[in-house]
Amino acid sequence: MDLNTDRALFSISVAAEVTGVNPQMLRIYEQKGLLEPHRTEGGTRRYSTRELERIGEIASLLAAGLNLAGVEQVLLLRAENLELRREIDHLRRKKPLVT
């Protein structure tokens, strides 16, 4: 079975059980902008596999001693780093380095 990592499949209770993070903390992560679960038409949160991975990242950073503001900065820097790597790869494909 091929699970699309962006497909919102999991309720908050399932996400909490799978990740070991209680539902209230998941709501706090959302309030702080660290997590953006999809919403059904009725407003129910639904989490994708990718979001479950992000919850794991957040939990690991918190366990390492960072506070939520520090976690936010690390996640922003990681996203920026990924974007820069993609841009570098694109430029390398566009014009190979002359040796």
Predicted segments, located by residue:
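C-terminal regulatory/oligomerization modules of transcriptional regulators
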Residues: 2, 76-99
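A short, Lys/Arg-enriched interface patch at domain edges and termini
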Residues: 54-86
